[in-house]
Amino acid sequence: MLLFEQPVDLEKNNEDDTNIKPFAISRHFLLKLLLCGIILIELLLYSKCPKPIDNGPRTIANRSNTYFNGTHDFKTLTILISIDGFHPRLIDAKYTPFLYNLHNLRSPYDMNITTAPYMIPSFPTQTFPNHWSMVTGKYPIEHGIVSNIFWDNFTSSEFRPNNLDARIWSNTADPIWQLLQTESQGEYKVATHMWPGSEVVYEDHGDVPRERMPFYFGKFNQWEKLQDKLAQIFRYIDMPQLKDRPELVISYIPNVDSYGHSFGYDLRDKRLQKLIGEVDGFFLDLIEGLQKRNLLKISNVMIVSDHGMSNVNANDGEHVVVWERVFPADAMSAFISHLYNEGPMMMVCLKNPRDKQWICDLIEAQLEKAYGDEISRKFHVILKEDFDPSWKYFQYDNRKHRYDDRVGDIWILADEYYAIVKEMGDVPIGIMGTHGYNFNNCSDMASIFIGMGPMFNNEVVPPFENIEVYNMLIKASALLGEEKTKKEKSLLQ
C-alpha cells in the first residue's frame, strides 16, 4: 500500500471565528480588506505546508504527537541500516554518488545531515560483536558477544553466527528493542530485518520477557535481493493501523562483506563497482520512498557499518601463516580444547589454563621455527590478561567482567595485512579480505556513519565509537527521559 503524496500537517490551526457587524464600507476600504484577506489566506496555506529544515537542531522530543501525511497518522519514524564491511573509502563520487553527496552534507530534499570521517568499531572488529555493540551501547566484553565464535562455559556449547541458542543470547546485554518495548509497555514497536542477534526466539525460555524479541523480525537470508529488502522495510512502514506500525526499523545488508572476503576491496574491480552502486541505489530508493509518502520530515535515518576490510596477499607465502605448521595436531589435542577464529587473530582455549604461560612461549617459539624471524614478528602471541587497555577488551578497566570466561586463554594477533588460518586447505588463492584487527593499529577497520533527519544538526562531527549509536536510538525514540538513559553523554546531547 502506497501512502499517497499529500502535505504533512505538522501544525494545528487555532484560528477563532469572529462576528463582524455590518457598517458602511468605502471602495478604498474594500480594496484594503480584500488585500488583507488574500495575505491572510496565503499565510494560512503556508502554515499547513511542511516547513523546510534549517541548519539547526530539529529534535522531535514529544512522542505523544502524531503527524498526518495526507492519508494516515504517523509517529516519528527511525530507520537504522547497517552495511556489513563497508569502509569509508567505498564512498565514491563515481560509484556511490548518493552516499557521496550525503557524506558531504548534500541532500536533494534539504535534509539535515550529520556525518563523521569514520566511526570507530569495537574490538574484535567482527560482525556479531559490533552489531550487538550498536544496539546495546556496550563493548563486546561488556555485552557478551565477545567474538564471532567462542566457547560458552555456562551452556557447554560453541557460539557461531548461525547459533540462535536462546540460552546463550539471553545471557547477553539487553538490546535497544527490549528497552523501548518494555518502557512503553508494548506500545512502541520495533521491527528488525536480518540484524545479527535479532531473530533469536525465546518462547521456550520461560524466564525471558517477550520484549526481548522485536515485535516484528525477519530471518537471515544472504541471497536476498536489495529490492526485496527495501520492499520489506516499506511493508513495515505502510501498515495501515498506527497501533500496529513499528516506530523503529532496523535492517542489515551483508552483500559487500561477503564479496570482500572472497576478493578484497579494489575500486578498480568492476564487480565491486557494480555491487556498491546497487547499495547506493538502495539508499536513494529508500529516501525517495519516504519522500513520496511525505514522511521524510518526520523520519530519522542512520546508515552505519560494523567495520571495514583489509586486503591480504595469500599468494606470496609470507602474509598468511598456517596453524598446523606451527602446532602439530597431536600436541594440540593434548593441551588445547578449542581453537577459534581465523584471519587477523586466533583464540586458543586451553584444557588447563594453568599451562597458559609455557604454552604461550611454545607457540611463539614454534612460529619462529616454522616461518623465520621476519614473518613471525608480524604475529604477536599474548595472554588474555595482556591486552592493551586501550582496546577495551579483557579487563580493560582493571575489573572483572561477567563474560571474561568467554575469552580464550591465549591470542595470536596478526599485524595489518597478515593473517593466520588453521589448515593448508584454508589458504585462499589470490587476494582475500579480512577483518578483526584492532582499529588503533589498522585504519582499514574504520566504519561509516551518516545520520539524516530532524534530530540531527547539519554538520561533520569528529569520529566517535559505535556504541554511541545506541544513545542516538534512545534519543530518536523520544520515549525515555534523559535520567533513564544511564549514559553520561551522547554525541547528540
Swiss-Prot record:
Keywords: Glycoprotein, Hydrolase, Membrane, Multifunctional enzyme, Phosphoprotein, Signal-anchor, Transmembrane, Transmembrane helix. This is Ectonucleotide pyrophosphatase/phosphodiesterase 2. Pfam families: Phosphodiest. Induction: Up-regulated during phosphate starvation. It is a single-pass type II membrane protein. Autophosphorylated as part of the catalytic cycle of phosphodiesterase/pyrophosphatase activity. One of its GO terms (molecular function) is nucleoside triphosphate diphosphatase activity. Its EC number is 3.1.4.1, 3.6.1.9. Residues 46-493 are extracellular. Belongs to the nucleotide pyrophosphatase/phosphodiesterase family. Coiled coil: none annotated. CDD domains: Enpp (cd16018). It is found in: Membrane. Mediates extracellular nucleotide derived phosphate hydrolysis along with NPP1 and PHO5. It comes from Saccharomyces cerevisiae (strain ATCC 204508 / S288c). InterPro entries: Alkaline_phosphatase_core_sf (IPR017850), Phosphodiest/P_Trfase (IPR002591). GO terms for biological process: nucleoside triphosphate metabolic process. The active site is at 127 (nucleophile). Residues 1-28 are cytoplasmic. It comes from the Eukaryota. It catalyses: Hydrolytically removes 5'-nucleotides successively from the 3'-hydroxy termini of 3'-hydroxy-terminated oligonucleotides; a ribonucleoside 5'-triphosphate + H2O = a ribonucleoside 5'-phosphate + diphosphate + H(+); a 2'-deoxyribonucleoside 5'-triphosphate + H2O = a 2'-deoxyribonucleoside 5'-phosphate + diphosphate + H(+). GO terms for cellular component: endoplasmic reticulum; membrane. The chain crosses the membrane at residues 29-45. Residues 76-438 are annotated as: Phosphodiesterase.
